[in-house]
A protein has these predicted regions:
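Acidic/histidine-rich catalytic cores of soluble enzymes
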Residues: 61-62, 164-266
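Short acidic/histidine-rich active-site segments
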Residues: 280-289
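Acidic-and-aromatic substrate-binding clefts and catalytic sites of carbohydrate-active enzymes
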Residues: 37-43, 61-77, 97-109, 136-140, ...
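A short helix->loop->beta-strand "cap" motif at the edges of active sites that frequently abuts
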Residues: 85-87, 125, 173-175, 275-279
Length: 339
């Protein structure tokens, strides 16, 4: 890394390498193997290495999506490759084609979660994260309210505590599980900080400790329908409860260049910093033409806008890292982030 910008606080900076695409990079093939380049290198590792080489700031973490059906030796190869770049690897536990809110799908959801939790433990991961509280882009679901919403929370608590127990998380290296809500359209029920926090709070109450955290993604906050002020107030309450988790610096609607965020990253990041509980910030950018996200573009055309402005996506990520590094340093300079 060229590391021209030195971080001036203890907040850890990382990336989510979705800018490399799901199709052709993060998604394994039918044999559970990752795509490789002409040199035989796993593309996600090669892509992150390129970013390390051009980034003006040293980042220390990478949050990788691991899908059900990925061969264990392939996961091992990705983790070892990323660790060789002096990066700590955080596991994103992906699930698909199943509904965590439906009791009939509980066994299937747990079966998808377990192998990657076990891999995370084997590799010494200190945190895992997931959106495993609802099915992505479901065409069968309607928004759950009232008693139906409470039932969805209860089922999710049952499912996630079962996954913890069966994977042997208690007493392992995994210190926290970060739950991410998604914008309306991607989800129908858990579509805001407030609604996702209801699950996190219930899960921790059932467990007896604050193990589950709420991942705060600036883009989803911006698209959730709540105002900046409403999100700021919720973040303060979530942090006071000991349930504030990882922060994603990502632009609302476009999910592209951070300059397209309409002010949301700055406002939500500052709100998290003011709590004194901000620990990790990850820059997340998506390729606007990723075939895996076509369904989302059909729901929200703004997701298909090309915000690169003549750059490659790796260059857009490098600029995003610089942007967030300066934000963190200036939050520290103003005394908002305190060490």
């Amino acid at each position: 890394m060229s590391a021209k910008i030195a971080l001036k606080s203890k907040v850890q900076l990382g990336i989510v390498p979705t800018h490399l695409r799901f199709v052709g990079c993060l998604l394994p093939d039918e044999n559970g193997r990752y795509p490789r380049n002409d040199d035989g290198d796993i593309i996600v590792v090669a892509g992150v290495k390129e970013l390390c080489e051009i980034s003006p700031v040293k980042f220390t973490h990478v949050q990788v999506s691991f899908f059900p059906g990925t061969a264990r030796e392939e996961i091992d190869a990705v983790v070892h490759g990323l660790k060789s770049l002096q990066l700590e690897v955080d596991f994103v536990l992906m699930v698909g084609g199943v509904n965590p809110m439906n009791p009939a799908d509980e066994d299937a959801v747990v079966a998808q979660l377990l192998p990657n939790i076990e891999a995370a433990i084997a590799h010494g991961a200190r945190s895992v994260s997931s959106t495993s509280i609802e099915e992505w882009m479901s065409t069968n679901e309607t928004r759950r309210e009232g008693a139906d919403f409470e039932a969805a929370i209860a089922q999710n608590v049952k499912l996630h505590l079962r996954a913890m127990r069966e994977a042997g998380i208690e007493g392992s290296c995994v210190e926290s599980w970060h739950i991410e809500f998604l914008r309306p359209g991607e989800f129908k029920t858990f579509t805001s900080l407030e609604r996702a926090w209801a699950f996190v709070s219930a899960a921790n109450k059932a467990l007896g400790r604050s193990f589950f955290k709420l991942l705060v993604d600036a883009s989803h906050c911006g698209d959730s329908g709540l105002t900046i002020a409403e999100n700021e107030a919720l973040i303060a309450r979530i942090a006071a409860a000991g349930e504030l988790g990882i922060f994603h610096a990502s632009a609302k609607t476009t999910r592209g260049c951070l300059s397209s965020d309409d002010g949301w990253i700055g406002a939500i990041l500052t709100a998290a910093a003011k709590t004194g509980e901000l620990r990790q910030v990850f820059v997340e950018i998506f390729d606007h033409a990723d075939p895996a996200l076509e369904a989302l573009r059909n729901v929200e055309p703004g997701h298909g806008v090309d915000t690169r402005d003549g750059r490659t996506y790796t260059e857009v990520m490098a600029d995003g890292l610089a942007d967030v590094a300066h934000r963190l340093n200036n939050l520290a300079a103003r005394g908002i982030i305190k060490d």
